[in-house]
């Protein structure tokens, strides 16, 4: 349930708020899409952690570029 709430908040941001700001993210996928995919793939806590780390890298002094959500390894199990 918490997961659905966070995913809904991210979608709201993407559909309503982000278009008002214009394209500013230096990464592909965008930071909001990265957080959405991370939460879908790893669950709420690890997804928020990965999304937060990404947001900390999204600044003018970072080159940006293609930075997908890491694939789960054999040791990583999704926590839902």
UniProtKB/Swiss-Prot annotation:
Location in the cell: Cell inner membrane
Primary location recorded for the protein, binned into one broad class: membrane
Residue intervals passing through the bilayer: none
Superkingdom, natural source: Bacteria
Key words of the record: Cell inner membrane, Cell membrane, Membrane
Keyword Cell inner membrane carried by entry: yes
InterPro entries cross-referenced by the UniProt entry: Membr_insert_effic_factor_YidD
Stored SMART domains: Haemolytic
Gene Ontology cellular component list: plasma membrane
Cited function: Could be involved in insertion of integral membrane proteins into the membrane.
UniProt protein name: Putative membrane protein insertion efficiency factor
């Amino acid at each position: 349930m918490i997961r659905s709430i966070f995913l809904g908040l991210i979608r709201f941001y993407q559909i309503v708020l982000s278009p008002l700001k214009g394209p500013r993210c230096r990464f592909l996928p965008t930071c909001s899409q990265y957080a959405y995919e991370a939460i879908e793939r790893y669950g709420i806590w690890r997804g928020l952690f990965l999304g937060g780390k990404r947001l900390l890298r999204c600044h003018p002094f970072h080159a940006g570029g293609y930075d997908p959500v890491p694939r789960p390894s054999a040791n990583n199990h999704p926590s839902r």
